[in-house]
């Protein structure tokens, strides 16, 4: 049986070494997020201030995998 994961939205607050980021979730929790392999392969840039979707394990809610970067509505790209 596959492990159940929670998907949250949050804001990148800090960039750390090795593709790690500090993420503030919408429920005000701070967790450590790492970039998923699909985002890494696609060369998607994630910077502080970006909104992301993050997948969090039920067993360790202090870490999560960033699975999607939400586009900003005010950018021209």
Curated annotation (Swiss-Prot):
Transmembrane segments: none annotated. Gene3D superfamilies: Nucleic acid-binding proteins. It comes from the Eukaryota. Keywords: Chloroplast, Initiation factor, Plastid, Protein biosynthesis, RNA-binding, rRNA-binding. GO terms for cellular component: chloroplast; cytosol. Its main location: plastid. It is found in: Plastid, Chloroplast. GO terms for molecular function: ribosome binding; rRNA binding; translation initiation factor activity. Residues 1-71 form the S1-like domain. InterPro entries: NA-bd_OB-fold, RNA-binding_domain_S1_IF1, S1_domain, TIF_IF1. Belongs to the IF-1 family. Component of the 30S ribosomal translation pre-initiation complex which assembles on the 30S ribosome in the order IF-2 and IF-3, IF-1 and N-formylmethionyl-tRNA(fMet); mRNA recruitment can occur at any time during PIC assembly. One of the essential components for the initiation of protein synthesis. Stabilizes the binding of IF-2 and IF-3 on the 30S subunit to which N-formylmethionyl-tRNA(fMet) subsequently binds. Helps modulate mRNA selection, yielding the 30S pre-initiation complex (PIC). Upon addition of the 50S ribosomal subunit IF-1, IF-2 and IF-3 are released leaving the mature 70S translation initiation complex. This is Translation initiation factor IF-1, chloroplastic. It comes from Vitis vinifera (Grape).
